[in-house]
Design a protein with these regions (language model features):
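Generic alpha-helical transmembrane segments of integral inner-membrane proteins
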Residues: 38, 80, 114, 118-122, ...
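Alpha-helical transmembrane segments in multi-pass integral membrane proteins
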Residues: 7-28, 42-70, 91-95, 99, ...
């Protein structure tokens, strides 16, 4: 008689990779979104030249002789946004079917975007506004979010970043969401995109550059890697993705934003300053991913996060109009004008969130999710 000894191995139950974990609201991430948006606003109002000079009546360097040099780093808020986006998109796409993912993203982006395009077009058409009116045909094309690849003038100055976001969503949807998210698949996606983006940069092929976005890919990829860290802080591959993404990301940021000290340049951004701001973005999302900021659980941070997207859409061009009215029209000092402009744009963002996003987003999401 042959006896077989059966050994019972007690294993800790493991959740399948394709199942989305129950996520608590990361309110610190909402707060970081608003910080990034305010960084970009500081850049648009006081950290650059161009059309904002018309709003102030002179260069922002004259309005903010001390702060303008710091405001010039605010453009890196976009890179911080991209890291946040990588984290959030991986989190929201995990365990979701493609239709649900598409419905979620479209309903999140489009209602406020459409209203922002209409608002800016209408305001710039007013005869008392000092800025160039938008052609009706261009405004209509802008409603599709495809104005940049179609070579049409942008209604919203910041919408170039949305074109980058849309391409990231498409890549993530095709490579991860459609076949089903898993740790292995996400790691392969990050590694493959990193390598492909490097090849695109070396090849200088315009089509590859459009699809793979070598200048911005590492920020999205870094955010995706940080979501893997959030799921398992001991994941060595995830930490490797984050480290490589930071190293590549800071390179592209320095290459595109550094300029030598030149009295004719608006501001001199140093290599160290650029790297530090990029590091801030990665470290802030890392702290959130590791749970170090879970104590920041105030409800107002959720409100701040809700205001970020509409604020980001309208703050630049409508902000110029407000600056011109307050500073040139009413003669208010620069500091008061700056503060009141930011406040008025936040108020407009609240109105858009309350009367546009809250009623329309769930309806659009439901309609898209039910459609065949």
């Amino acid at each position: 008689v042959t006896t077989t000894t059966v050994r019972q191995v007690i294993e800790t139950p493991r959740r399948p990779d394709r199942t989305a974990p129950r996520e608590t609201r990361l309110r610190a991430l909402d707060g970081l979104r608003l910080v990034a948006a305010l960084m970009v606003a500081a850049y648009h109002y006081g950290g650059r030249g161009g059309e904002v000079t018309t709003a102030w009546g002179s260069s922002p360097k004259d309005q903010f002789p001390t702060l303008s040099g710091y405001f010039a780093y605010g453009c890196l808020g976009v890179q911080v946004f991209f890291v946040i986006s990588g984290f959030v998109i991986c989190m929201s796409g995990w365990g979701r079917p493609l239709k649900s993912f598409f419905a979620s993203r479209a309903s999140r982006l489009l209602p406020a975007y459409w209203v922002a395009v209409v608002l800016v077009t209408a305001v710039f058409a007013l005869p008392m506004v000092a800025f160039k009116a938008v052609a009706p045909s261009d405004a209509l094309v802008n409603m599709t979010m495809l104005q940049q690849p179609l070579g049409v003038d942008r209604v919203l100055g910041v919408c170039w970043t949305l074109w980058a976001e849309v391409r990231f969503y498409a890549l993530f949807a095709l490579c991860v969401v459609l076949p089903g998210a898993s740790r292995r698949r996400v790691i392969m996606f990050c590694a493959g995109w990193t390598l492909a983006a490097a090849i695109a940069q070396a090849s200088r092929e315009p089509l590859l550059d459009i699809v793979l976005m070598p200048e911005y890919a590492s920020f999205f990829i870094g955010g995706v890697g940080l979501y893997l860290v959030h799921r398992d802080r001991r994941d060595v591959y995830a930490w490797g993705i984050v480290a490589v993404s930071f190293l590549i990301g800071q390179h592209y940021a320095v290459r595109s934003l550094w300029n030598a000290a030149d009295p004719n340049a608006f501001a001199h951004r140093t290599t160290l300053g650029i790297v530090l701001v990029v590091a801030f973005g990665f470290l802030a999302v890392t702290a959130i991913a590791l749970g170090w900021l879970n104590w920041a659980n105030w409800r107002w941070l959720t409100v701040a996060g809700a205001l970020t997207y509409p604020f980001y859409l309208v703050h630049e061009h409508l902000g110029w109009v407000v600056i011109h009215g307050l500073h040139i029209g009413l003669g208010l000092p620069s500091a008061e004008t700056f503060a009141l402009t930011v406040t008025s744009m936040l108020l407009l963002a609240w109105l858009m969130n309350r009367y546009v996003e809250k009623p329309l987003t769930p309806k659009l999401r439901s309609a898209l999710a039910k459609a065949r």
